[in-house]
Amino acid sequence: MYLGLKVGVTFASSIPAAVISMAVLKFFKDSSILENNMVQTQASSAGTLSSVIFVLPGLLMMGYWQDFPFWQTMLICAAGGTLGVLFTIPLRRAMVVNSNLPYPEGVAAAEILKAGNHADGDSGVKDIAYGGVLAGLVAFLTNGLRVMADGASAWIQTGKAAFQLPMGFSLALLGAGYLIGIVGGIAMLIGVILTWGVAVPYFTMSEDIAADASLIDSAMTVWKTKVRYIGVGTIGIAAIWTLLILMKPMIEGMVHSFRMLKGGQEASEHRIDIDLSPKTMIYILIATVALIVISLHHFIAAAPISPELSILLVVVCTFLAVFIGFFVAAASGYMAGLVGSSSSPISGIGIISVIVISLVLVSIGNASGLFETVDGQKFLTALTLFTASIVITTACISNDNLQDLKTGLLVEATPWRQQVALIIGCFVGALVIAPVLEILYHAYGFSGALPRPDMDPSQALSAPQATLMTAISQGIFTNKLEWTYILTGVGLGAVLITIDAFLKKVSNKVFSLPVIAVGIGIYLPPSINTPVIVGAFLAWIMARHIAKLGNKEVSAKAERFGTLFSAGLIVGESLMGVILAFIIAASVTTGGSEAPLSLNLENWDTIGEWFGLIVFIVGIVIFASRVLRAKKI
């Protein structure tokens, strides 16, 4: 949570939860893989709720809240998380069981649990351990000692146009890309090319550059303020299209569940195919909606508005939270399956949610006269962020939930038990969100919101996503938001959807273009996209090389070695991220540095970039050698 508020970076919790669960339960006799999976499932859902930091701090940054009310914060986290679990239950069959989506973290977590469960699984443990040690060491050099850059870029200037050739050095993302595969990798590459080879050069060439700004700084500003919104529009239209495509299998999944409820032949034959019953889901949904109504009522009751308008806003915002929540659950689950939870642009989903909620409340504000006062506009902005916080927790849990269900499918867990564990995890996690946020706020403050006048603004947590969401909402209510780029992204997405449909038709679904992955390539920083793309191409090259041998047994071994080593890379970097987060938090809370382990070498920037590139290449070579040893066994 600290790192998310400081630099906008969070990490998927499923894999650290799997490792910790496996390590702890090893001390108990006869612990099983299913017990490990249950603990991992519950722990990961609790940790995922921390992503509420993408929106909620905005209420303090705009001056509407002075602290984080425990019950309101707890209720929206628990309710939003539970919605995320419920909405992904009918998606499980469509997106996990009957889908070829890779779910990289889910597969990695399953391999960890399998390797730790079998007494004869030494080879699996070794592959995971090798990958984990390598990625952990690289992460320590990068984020701990800070002697190695996490990425590098080559800039090409042609007149006023700036082209970037970027590269990130994350081995965890390299492993995620290996699991994602070539189709998703090519789509993300197209997004990167459209961004840094077309859009950014066009805007830098067509606009005047400030006298005191470098071309590189101007290019990065163009990406942040314009091109990223094109990615938001592309992701939005692609998510809607994906939801329409998935509607039929989702309905079939729900029909299957209702048949089981009636006691059909399939009712109890397959333990690994049983979800929570529709009857139970309806009861939980009603209770969850009641929690949302209660939290919204208490939030709105503090505003000086009429009882009738208060009731209207409670009803409308509850509907928006549930309706948009279902939409983002499907979109987030699909993106998590396509590119992984760590690379899934949750903040992009949050932006779409904030825009939709703001537009609805704008119409109510105009009709009710709330726009006539500054306080009325401030209240509607705050209500937008409060409602969007429910939606963002729904998106984050669904993003993580389907990874956990993929893990469960691979280790033959019972889905309904996992779903119960996920809901319990949501409530447990919700209990600690408000106290932790309160501690961080009073320890550091947020940008533009310091709890005490004597605090150092330079030490404040920037909360970049919350700042962005607040600015977008305020821009809509003050009619200052630039819509051109979002609509451009929608148009681009529509063109790409047409191309995808054409490719599938002429190739009999052999070729496709995942439009959401293209949008992700536009929206996310290139340091995240590029190692994923490299990993995807590495998997393709390895598969083609092994396939030339014509030995199916060797191909199967190579695939398993690659999966295990990828899992190790993801595990190592994730765990090192957790360890460094604790070290940094301990240092800062005691008045120390934000980089307590940094060597602070002078004139090291260029050397650090070359060092990072060399280590990244070495990591690729080691990865390939671990896969190719399948030919020798």
From Swiss-Prot:
Membrane topology term: Multi-pass membrane protein
Keyword terms, alphabetized: Cell membrane, Membrane, Peptide transport, Protein transport, Transmembrane, Transmembrane helix, Transport
Keyword Cell membrane: yes
UniProt main location, coarse: membrane
Superkingdom of the source species: Bacteria
One CC-aspect GO term: membrane
InterPro entries tied to this protein: Oligopep_transpt, OPT, YSL-like
Keyword Heme: no
One BP term from GO: protein transport
Ranges in a coiled coil: none
GO molecular function, one term: oligopeptide transmembrane transporter activity
Residues spanning the membrane: 8-28, 45-65, 70-90, 128-148, 180-200, 230-250, 281-301, 311-331, 345-365, 379-399, 420-440, 483-503, 515-535, 564-584, 604-624
Protein localization: Cell membrane
Family listed: Belongs to the oligopeptide OPT transporter family.
Protein name as catalogued: Putative oligopeptide transporter HI_0561
Organism: Haemophilus influenzae (strain ATCC 51907 / DSM 11121 / KW20 / Rd)
